[in-house]
Design a protein with these regions (language model features):
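Extracellular and organelle-lumenal recognition/adhesion modules and their flexible linkers in secreted
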Residues: 1-185
Length: 185
């Protein structure tokens, strides 16, 4: 493949998203402990393409994930907004996790992978975790009640939209996928 150079003469990384159905969380995504997923929510981009992810019972580890065979340095990102709870946990399988306060835009202190959070307006944040993935399952998105705690109560919820998994050190602009992965640039 060709190397892209920008106007400043710098090498530019091509973009990719290896997650399937990157914003259809009720399709190729697998649920852990049966969170309820409701589409048609108001999103960060002004569309009604966001999803409410809600705990349908009290307990721990209410999550969604995909089985993806991908290795190397990976960045997993998702847009998230607080609902009735302020926290999410993101996990790269076989690597570790990081907590995010999606009400206040803070990366939690609990976790074993690097995390970043960026405000995109209207209470939405793009959260991302970085690590060297070496397993065929994951990435995960969990509803969390606090930094370091995935125990939730019935009805606890957060809003999510536009997940992306890619090679690299930082999340690139989102690329939507359907039944296949996508690349650009």
């Amino acid at each position: 493949s060709a190397t892209r150079i920008d106007r400043a003469g710098l090498i530019v990384k091509g973009r990719e998203n290896v997650i399937l159905q990157s914003n259809q969380f009720d399709t190729t995504w697998i649920t852990t402990n049966a969170p309820t997923l409701t589409s048609g929510q108001s999103g960060y981009d002004g569309t009604n393409d966001a999803w409410k992810m809600e705990a349908s019972s009290t307990g721990s580890s209410r999550a969604i994930y995909q089985n993806i065979s991908s290795s190397g340095v990976q960045v997993f990102s998702v847009y998230a907004k607080a609902g009735t709870t302020d926290w999410i946990r993101m996990n790269l399988s076989g690597v570790g996790n990081r907590y995010f306060d999606v009400a206040n835009g803070v990366v939690g202190s609990n976790g074993s992978v690097d995390g970043t959070i960026t405000s995109v307006g209207n209470g939405w944040y793009r959260c991302s975790v970085l690590g060297t993935q070496n397993a065929s399952s994951g990435p995960y998105i969990f509803i969390a009640s606090a930094n370091g705690d995935t125990s939730v109560n019935t009805g606890d919820n957060v809003y999510i939209q536009d997940a992306q998994l890619e090679q690299g050190l930082a999340a690139s602009p989102y690329i939507e996928t359907t039944t296949t992965s996508a690349q650009a640039g």
